[in-house]
Structure formats: C-alpha cells, structure tokens
Amino acid sequence: MVHMLGGNLLLAGIVIKLSQGQTVIESLTGQADAAYWLILAGVAVNAAIPPFNAWIADAYPESTMGGTVYMGSFTTKVGVFCLIKLFAGTELLLYFGVFMAVWGVCMALIENDFRRLFAYHIISQVGYMIASLAIGGEIGIDGASAHAFNNILYKGTLLMCAGTVIAATGKRKISQLSGLAKKLPITASCFLIASMAIAGFPLLNGFVSKSLIMNAAAESGFYWAELLLMIASVGTLMSVTLKVNYFVFWGKSTEDIEACEKDVPLSRKAAMILGALACIITGLFPDLIYSLTPYGTDGHPFTVDHVTQYIQLFAAAAIAFVMYIDHMKPKEKITLDTDWFYRKPLKYTVLCLSKGIDYVRRKAGDSLGVFFERVNEYLHEPRLLITDKPPKSRDCLEDDDVLQKPVGWLIALSFILFAAIVVFILVKI
C-alpha cells in the first residue's frame, strides 16, 4: 500500500509535466510547482523520508529472511538513486536526512526485536545518503553513491547473520538470546565485522564512505550536520556494534538456547563470509569504491586527524556503554514510532467522519422514504394534488362539496384565459 501511494504520487507529478509538454528529466523538478512536490513526495515515500518512514519497521521484519536481505539492501536505494538524479543539492532534504540518521539510531537503541532494530538502521543509513546528496556538489553526490554501495555490503551481511540466528534459535528478541558466539562462531565473526563497518570503524568500508559525507558537510559549511551525523555514528556503534554483539553473541552463554553452526547451510555461510570480506577489502582499498562514483572523487580518508577522531569517539562511546550496561539491556516493551502521532488522531477523525456520514445517510434515507410515501399517496389518490384534505371515504366523494370550490376556480380561470386570447387575436386583426 505504501509503495502504491508513492507510485501514484510520482505518476501524478509526471503526468502533470507531460501535459505541459515537458519530457526531459531535468524539467521534472525545474520549478517548485505542484508536479515538483508530487514527484518529491512520491520518491520520499519509497526512500522512507519522515513522516513516511514508519512502514519500514512494520513491513521489513515481517517478510521472509531472504526477502528482508533483498529489500533492506536494495529497495530504499532505488529511492536514493531517484533523489540523486532529481533533487541533488536540495537543501530541504538535508534536514530530513540528518533527522533520519539520528532518529533511526535512537529507535534502535531501545528496540528489542532483532529484525526491527535493523529496520531502524536502514532508516538511519539512508539518512546519511539523503543528507549527502542534499549537500550536493561532487563530493556530496559521490559520498551518497559510495555509502549506498557500501550499505548493500554490510547491511546485507548483517541481515543474513540476523536471519541465521533467528533460524537457528527460533527467537528474534535480543533479551531472549545470549552467548551465541560459541555455538555460531562463523556467524558471530561475520556479524562483528559488518557491525564495525556500519558504525564507521577505520579500515572498513563504512569509514571510507562516511568520510566523504563528513567532508562534504564541512566544506559546504554545514557544521551542525557534520556534528549530528557524527553523533549518529556513535549511536550506531552503541546500538549494533556494542549492544547486539554483547547481548546476543559475546555475553554469558545460556544452555537453554539450542543452536549449532553445522545446521547453517553452506551457501549462507559462504554469503556471510564473502560479505564480511567485501567490507574489509573495500575498506582497505577505498579507491575501489571511489572509482565507481559519478565524479570519481579522489578521497583520502586515512589521515591521522580523521582516524584519531573516530577512535577517540568510539572509545568514549565504549566506556559509556560499559558504565551504563545495565540500562542498555533490551527490555520487553512496545516501541512507539512516528506513525503513532497520526494513527491516534486519525482513528478519532475517521470515527467522527464515519458518524457524520452515517447521520447524513440516515437522514437522506428518511427523506427519501417520506418522498416516496407521498408519491405513492398521490398515485393512489390524484385528487390530493388539488386539495390537502383527502375525502373521508370513497363512498361520499359525489356528495361531499370539498372539491367544488377548487374546480370552480379552475373553470373560471380557464374562461378568463380563453377570453384574453380571443381579445388579443381580435386586436391584432
């Protein structure tokens, strides 16, 4: 339904442009008219831009394991690609992108459901891409493109590892899992590498693409955006790299959880290992990614200042995690998303509208009932058309004088009208 809404909004905007005789892509967003906003809204729905972001956390976790990997890795990237082609350099999107990056990690920090947690990180990572393309310029667009590519690698690996854990244990709540590194060592190792990559650890691919985004924000003067995106990186570290690794894989093992690496299909193991290796290789050799970007930006992520800055931030975050580890433990509770802001009032709005429509329907039905009842009376008793007093009985119609006066007036009116016509004709002659 959400994609249908986005597709129809996009189609409506394109139809308006076509009716104006404009078929070039650049003309689709040339001016901020109705078509511009329809196209932007249509793409925003598919890219999970607020307030159209809650559907990801509701839909993705309920799909199949393989479906989640494909959708989490590719679906929202199509929306990002459209935004790069149509709305690159639109400053309005910068605010939405930064909000998505921060909001996603905040929700992931308190989320207990394994799959919903990664759904929120999809929103957060897409926020980085949208913020980068909104900054525009060669570095901004290349940063968004590189991060989209890298996101496919580490996000796909993370989702495969999560699916392996759920398939092996039959549980998807983090609070129900612990110490799986001994039982699923390959899965745990691949997850650790991918979780460090998504946080932006140096020497991994997430670091090289985030470096472009941060440089684009700094060079464009958006220092506030750079700061908030750095905070989002720290939140990613705490919610995935530390929280999930500790409570699911490397914490105290419990004997009541049955899981065995031998039960994991060989094809899935190979896919996880290849994904983890890809995160390492593209992180050690960033030119492999930079050369594929639209402008081929020559980035230099491994400067001493840049690497030191990330290490200091992550070290401080790790210390804070250890200090508040009891508060970081996931709890069994419902996570309220942004959709609750409009679901509650929308419920009462629909209820009030339904009552209003039902009232109009009942009144219209009653009025139609009275109307047809009167019509039925007139059809059975045509004399009611010339008098409001129906005869007392059909036997006394000839003796009752109730109809005499109206009939006499009609005859008199007929004679007067006839006389007027005759006089008019004689005068004309």
Language model segments and positions:
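Hydrophobic transmembrane alpha-helices and their helix-loop junctions in integral membrane proteins
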Residues: 1-263, 284
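Hydrophobic alpha-helical transmembrane segments
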Residues: 40-43, 226-234, 303-322
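Hydrophobic alpha-helical membrane-embedded segments
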Residues: 155, 235-239, 316-333
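Juxtamembrane/interfacial segments flanking transmembrane helices
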Residues: 48-54, 173, 203-204, 208-210, ...
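Hard-cation-handling environments
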Residues: 262-316
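Aromatic-capped, Gly/Pro-kinked transmembrane alpha-helices
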Residues: 291, 295-304, 326-429
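Alpha-helical transmembrane segments of multi-pass membrane proteins
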Residues: 198-201, 280-287, 323, 421-429
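Hydrophobic core of alpha-helical transmembrane segments in multi-pass integral membrane proteins
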Residues: 11-14, 102, 274-281, 312-324, ...
